């Protein structure tokens, strides 16, 4: 063992020496971030109708136009106008995972958020405690309970804002003490656990909590004994139950008269506000009449599905404040309780009860009979009913939320909030290119990376290409007609994007194969007709999926005691595949049970690499990437979140896996979901964690946060477009973001020693303005790219008066731009204009007067066709008011001293002069030859 450690130490020392020699930027992290990274902006492009899981809604009792919407992994949103617009108000906190949001009844500017989603599924986002705002969500303070991770309910005392109760489920994947009910008497400065439930030494969480509106010292709590494992889920136990306190939590009594005993799962509670003696509970009864307690308990502890029928989800009612209960429903109501388990009583009629699951069920006779409440939603998690008008509802579900004013007969889905939960993303090579994303419970979607002209990207611009839950997808880079996409458990399809025909192509000859919930596959970079698909073996097709062959043995640990959990999340499966783009036949795979293997002969022989990885956690392999630049080089990441280990695990090999070097280095304690290597700069790497994006420009020696205007959000996938040099970010809760990273690709030591540096300028198409479809006002506006080229430049030292950039058409000076002079990287956009005639003194004086008095109105540009370039030599102004399309004002279109004309497509020179030295780049403006496509 000592010799092995010595070997790794020598490797690490050699690697560090090599990094020091080739290090690109000798800056500390803060300096690099402030001088460079802050200038990289992300464009949020949506989509919106294809939303994400909404789990909590808090409506002001003083003004129902004001409410807060909590998305499981997608943060917190606020409206003050009944949903016409929403503002994201939780973008920069430590987590985006929302468990519950509530308003202080005494002061609605006081908002409490329990973080960490309480719906127990494989992609649920954890939190970091409880937050408080005293200004309606403008600012937040973390008030502790950081290790609870998942909070099911928060209740504020109706007369005393300092008293708050929290129902904490605790960590999902391990036992921890931070489970139970907590109480604060000082507004969150300190907390005391007031209900602790244990089974032997195991702590049991609390998932629901309700308060008697007559007496705030009376509370009911639902405990939930459960734990998730990487291979399955133990969803019930003997310590799940309902507890009551009548003295604010000093003493609790477990309620039992009329309630089931034995093995119980998740419990949802509801109290009728007009008569709080009436309570409802929906209880998952996991007992089986055909099995003994011990037999069933062993199955649950081993995360195995029940071998015999269980009782199911039963509704109970109490009419005497929980002293006695009776079974209200005759049979099973609702679906998977761990993912739902919500029961709601109409605030104005105690006989009307709703249960949320895949659908919404309703009983109008106090739970005796049940029917479908309405045909809307899907995988429903929260239902708010207006206490003064039961017709007014807000429903939250897996793809967003909606409002009804007629008890659910008709709904309005909110299309102005971007909440898409992406598992995987990709792109095509069309021009402009499209992005593709596989979404939680909403299939696979395709949308534009940009819009021609300057209009925003709307939800109408997105196309649904596959149903189910959406995961990995690939587009043939030589012919975007062929799209391969996938639903859960490896359900692979080939889509003909020309005809719309879809053909299922998943390998089915071997029924014993195991496919992961999110099964990886790829198209060979050497031949896109070749597909590699991961099960517990690696599959290969040489003819676009029409026939398959198994090219490996079982590449997992194949632990039969763990394969197949209670929710059928297949375990012992391949979770990552990489192919060398430099050498055909070199394939890498990683599995969910920690194996890393390589073949160099297209599957003829395989080698297990686990022992070569120093301090190998043998966790779930989240990503494997083969280098674009060096033979034998690959990157490997593990995620430990399935074992409650949140440290980053990241490795690099340069010798086909014989040796590995840890390169997580200064990355914070956040699990890594994805790593990408830049296709131009081998030392430029990006990782996506459960919180944000990080970048290194020295091959992993130092990492820098690249959050900027990106919200705190889990990053499940990253892609780099090889032609456009765009970093495409797939978030699990906020859709797509795109950033131009081309300047990062150029950064090197020589650059930084210069007084200044002008980066290469990306070509820009001068798009013909298309006609715009009429869309609803209440619609999300995805950010389009700037219509003119962005000019980036570096300054070694600051220039207080800024810099001037001169633009030339060949040798002719045509325009001048004013740019910032900050130390580090700067940028300015050229609006594709040139100077026209000089303004008269009278016009300048009029301008100055209007500016001084505030009378000057914003200037807008009107144009919508390419006709102004039809006549050779024609000079076209940018004030064509006779044309029909108005687009927003942008700097540089109008000046104090000059009128401006629009330039024609061509090659222009951009010159910046610093300390008597000129720096020059070409700016290629392309004609729109695609306008009629």
Can you say where each PLM-predicted feature lies in the sequence?
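Bacterial N-terminal signal peptides that target proteins for export
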Residues: 2-16
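Beta-strand-rich binding/interaction modules
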Residues: 493-495, 789-792, 798-816, 907-911
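Bacterial N-terminal signal peptides
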Residues: 14-26
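Short acidic/polar inter-strand loop motif in beta-rich domains
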Residues: 836-839, 913-921
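Short beta-strand elements
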Residues: 917-932
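Contiguous beta-strand segments within globular domains
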Residues: 770-802, 808, 825-829
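Glycine-centered tight-turn motifs at strand-turn-strand junctions
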Residues: 617, 813-902
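Beta-propeller blade termini and top-face loops
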Residues: 30-779, 786-787, 798
């Amino acid at each position: 063992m000592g010799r092995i450690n010595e070997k790794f130490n020598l490797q690490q020392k050699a690697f560090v020496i090599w990094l020091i020699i080739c290090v690109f930027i000798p800056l500390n992290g803060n300096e690099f971030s402030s001088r460079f990274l802050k200038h990289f902006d992300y464009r949020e492009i949506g989509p919106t109708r294809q939303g994400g899981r909404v789990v909590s809604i808090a409506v002001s009792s003083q003004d129902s136009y004001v409410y807060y919407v909590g998305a499981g992994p997608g943060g917190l949103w606020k409206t003050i106008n009944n949903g016409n617009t929403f503002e994201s108000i939780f973008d920069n906190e430590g987590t985006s995972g929302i468990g519950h949001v509530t308003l202080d009844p005494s002061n609605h500017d006081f908002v409490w958020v329990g973080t960490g989603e309480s719906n127990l599924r494989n992609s649920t986002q954890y939190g970091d405690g409880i937050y408080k705002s005293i200004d309606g969500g403008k600012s937040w303070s973390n008030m502790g309970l950081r290790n609870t991770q998942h909070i099911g309910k928060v209740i504020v005392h109706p007369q005393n804002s300092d008293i708050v109760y929290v129902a904490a489920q605790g960590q999902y994947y391990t036992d921890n003490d931070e489970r139970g009910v907590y109480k604060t008497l000082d507004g969150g400065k300190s907390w005391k656990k007031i209900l602790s439930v244990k089974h032997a030494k195991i702590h049991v969480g609390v998932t629901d909590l309700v308060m008697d509106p007559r007496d705030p010292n009376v509370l009911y709590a639902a405990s939930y004994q459960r734990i998730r494992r990487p291979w399955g889920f133990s969803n019930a136990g003997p310590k799940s139950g309902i507890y009551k306190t009548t003295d604010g939590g000093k003493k609790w009594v477990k309620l039992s008269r009329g309630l089931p005993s034995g093995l119980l799962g998740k419990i949802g509670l509801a109290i009728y506000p007009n008569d709080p003696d009436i309570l409802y509970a929906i209880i998952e009864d996991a007992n089986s009449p055909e099995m003994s307690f011990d037999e069933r308990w062993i199955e649950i502890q081993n995360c195995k599905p029940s071998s015999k029928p269980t009782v199911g989800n039963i509704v109970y009612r109490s009419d005497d404040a929980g002293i006695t209960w009776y079974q209200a429903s005759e049979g099973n109501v609702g679906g998977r309780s761990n993912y739902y388990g919500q029961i709601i009583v109409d605030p104005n009629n105690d006989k009307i009860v709703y249960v949320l699951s895949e659908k919404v069920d309703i009983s109008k006779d106090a739970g005796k009979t049940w029917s479908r409440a309405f045909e809307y939603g899907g995988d429903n998690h929260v239902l708010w009913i207006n206490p003064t008008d039961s017709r007014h509802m807000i429903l939250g579900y897996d793809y967003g939320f909606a409002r009804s004013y007629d008890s659910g007969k008709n709904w309005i889905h909110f299309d102005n909030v971007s909440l898409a939960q992406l598992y995987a993303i990709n792109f095509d090579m069309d021009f402009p290119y499209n992005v593709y994303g596989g979404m939680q419970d909403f299939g696979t979607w395709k949308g534009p990376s940009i819009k021609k002209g300057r209009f925003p990207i709307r939800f109408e611009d997105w196309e649904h290409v596959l149903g189910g839950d959406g995961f990995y997808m690939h587009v043939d880079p030589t012919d975007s007609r062929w799209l391969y996409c996938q639903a859960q458990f490896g359900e692979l399809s080939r889509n003909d994007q020309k005809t719309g025909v879809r053909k299922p192509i998943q390998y089915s000859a071997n029924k014993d194969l195991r496919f992961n919930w999110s099964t990886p596959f790829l198209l060979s970079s050497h031949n896109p007709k070749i597909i590699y698909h991961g099960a517990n073996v690696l599959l290969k097709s040489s003819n676009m999926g029409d026939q398959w062959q198994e090219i490996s043995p079982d590449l997992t640990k194949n632990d039969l005691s763990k394969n197949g959990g209670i929710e059928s999340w297949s375990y012992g499966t391949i979770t990552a595949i990489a192919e060398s783009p430099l050498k055909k036949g070199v394939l890498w795979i990683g599995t969910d049970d920690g194996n890393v293997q390589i073949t160099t002969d297209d599957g003829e022989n395989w080698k297990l690499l686990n022992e070569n990885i120093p301090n190998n956690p043998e966790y779930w392999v989240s990503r494997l990437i083969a280098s674009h630049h060096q033979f034998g080089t690959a990157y490997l990441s593990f995620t430990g979140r399935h074992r409650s280990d949140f440290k980053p695990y990241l490795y690099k090999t340069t010798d086909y896996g014989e040796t590995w070097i840890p390169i997580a280095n200064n990355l914070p304690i956040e699990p890594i979901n994805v790593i990408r290597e830049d296709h131009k700069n081998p030392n430029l790497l990006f990782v996506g964690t459960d919180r944000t994006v990080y970048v290194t420009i020295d091959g992993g020696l130092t990492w820098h946060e690249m959050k900027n205007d990106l919200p705190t959000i889990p990053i499940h996938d990253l892609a780099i477009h090889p032609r456009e040099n765009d970093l495409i970010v797939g978030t699990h809760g906020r859709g797509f973001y795109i950033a131009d990273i081309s300047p990062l690709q150029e950064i090197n030591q020589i650059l930084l020693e210069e007084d200044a540096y002008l980066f290469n300028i990306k070509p820009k198409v001068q798009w013909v303005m298309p006609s715009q479809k009429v869309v609803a006002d209440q619609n999300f506006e995805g950010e389009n790219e700037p219509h003119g080229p962005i000019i980036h430049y570096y300054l070694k030292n600051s220039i207080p008066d800024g810099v001037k950039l001169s633009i030339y058409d060949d040798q002719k000076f045509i325009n001048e731009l004013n740019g910032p002079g900050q130390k580090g990287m700067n940028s300015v956009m050229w609006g594709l204009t040139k100077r026209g005639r000089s303004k008269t003194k009278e016009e300048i004086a009029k301008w100055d007067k209007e500016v001084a008095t505030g009378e000057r109105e914003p200037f807008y540009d009107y144009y919508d066709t390419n006709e102004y370039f039809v006549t050779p030599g024609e000079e076209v102004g940018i004030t064509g008011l006779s044309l029909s399309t108005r687009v927003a004002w942008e700097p540089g279109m109008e000046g104090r001293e000059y009128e401006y004309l629009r330039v024609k497509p061509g090659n222009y020179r951009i010159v910046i002069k610093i300390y008597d030295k000129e720096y020059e780049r070409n700016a290629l403006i392309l004609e729109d030859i695609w306008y009629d496509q």
